[in-house]
Amino acid sequence: MKHTGIIRAGLILTGLVLISSTTAPKKEAAPTGPDYQTLVNTAYAKYKDLKEGKNADYIPALAEVPSDLFGIGLVTVDGKAFTAGDIQTMVSIQSISKVLTLARVIEEQGAQAIEDKVGVDATGEVFNSITAIERMKGKEINSCVNPGAIATTSMVKGDSYEAKWKSIIDTHSDFAGRALTVNEPVYKSEAATNQRNQAIAQLLFAYDRMYWDPAKSTDLYTKQCAINVNAHDLAEIAATFANGGINPVTGKVVVSPNSVEHTLAVMATAGLYDDSGIWLYHVGLPGKSGVGGGIIAVCPGKFGIGVVAPPLDAAGNSVKGQKVVRDLVDQLKANLYLVQPVVPAPAKKK
C-alpha cells in the first residue's frame, strides 16, 4: 500500500511538472514602430514660418493661392494617417498628375509601350523645353516633363474625349481614395495661357510622337493638372504607390505592382524637374512635385508622404515640401540607398 501511495504521488507530481513545462512563455513586448505623428508635428513646427520661395505666377490662378498654406500628410501601407497643419485646403495637383496618368497607361498598354513611344530618359532640359524634342534622335524624353506627359496623356485608352477623361479622373480618385474634382478657375486660367504646351503638342505630332488629336490631348493634360487635392490626398496617393498599387485606406486595386515599379523608376529619374538628381542624392526616394505647391515621396513597402506649400524654388519645387520630406526621411532612415554593412569588416591583426 505504501508503494502504491508513492506511485500515485509521483504521478501527481509528474502531472504538475508536465503542466508547468507546457505553460506558454511570457510574451515579450512587441517592438514599437516609429512615432510618425511626433515626427510630422516636429517637421511642421520647424518649417511653418519659413518664408523662402515664391508662388508660381505664370499661371495667374496659382499666384492667388495663399503663400502661407502648409500641410503635411504621411500614410503608411497599413492605412494609418498622420497629419499636421492645413490638410483640407485644396490646391491643383499640376505635374503630380503626370505620374498617375503614366501609371494608368502602363497598366493599359504595358511598360514597353511607354519606353517605345515616349521614352524614359532624363532630357537634361527644362520641363517645358521645345528644343529637347528636336534634339532627340529617338524617344529620349519621359512622362515627367511636359512633352512626354502630353504624349502619355494622348495614349490613354478611350474612343472619345469623355471616355479618356473618365479614365484619368477615375484613376486620380482611386489613388486618392475619394472622388476628386477639377478646380475650374485654375483649368480656365491654364487653358487661356497654355500656348507653349499647344506648340509642344503640335511639334510632337509633326514628329509622329502624338497618339491622338494634339489639341484635345493638350486640353486633357491641362484639365488633369487642375484636379483639386489636399495634403492628405497626396499622402494617400503616395501610399498607394508604396503599397504596390493598392490603396491602403480603401483596399482598392488601382494599378498592378508592375505599373508601380516602372512609374517609380521614371519618378526617380525626373520627378523634380531640373533638381531630380539633387533630390535623389539627398532623399533617395522616388518623388514628384507640382507647381501648385504639392510634392509626394514614396517609400516602397512602408509609407507615402504628401506636402502642400505653394512657394517654389527656382526649379519649380515646393521649398517647404522638399525640406519636410528630407527631414522625415533622415529621421526614419528611409533613404533607399542607405546601406549598413551586412558582413562585418574582418578584425585587424594585432
Segments and roles (model prediction):
Residues 16-31:
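Bacterial Sec-dependent signal peptides at the C-terminal "C-region" and cleavage site
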Residues 29, 243-350:
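Structured C-terminal helix/loop/strand segments within mature extracytoplasmic catalytic/sensor domains
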Residues 99, 200, 228-246, 299-310:
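Active-site-proximal alpha-helical segments within enzyme catalytic domains
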Residues 59, 65, 75-89:
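Short, conserved catalytic-motif segment at the N-terminal edge
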Residues 27-72:
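Beta-lactamase-like hydrolase cores
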Residues 79, 92-115, 237, 305:
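Active-site SXXK
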Residues 1-11:
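Bacterial N-terminal signal peptides that target proteins for export
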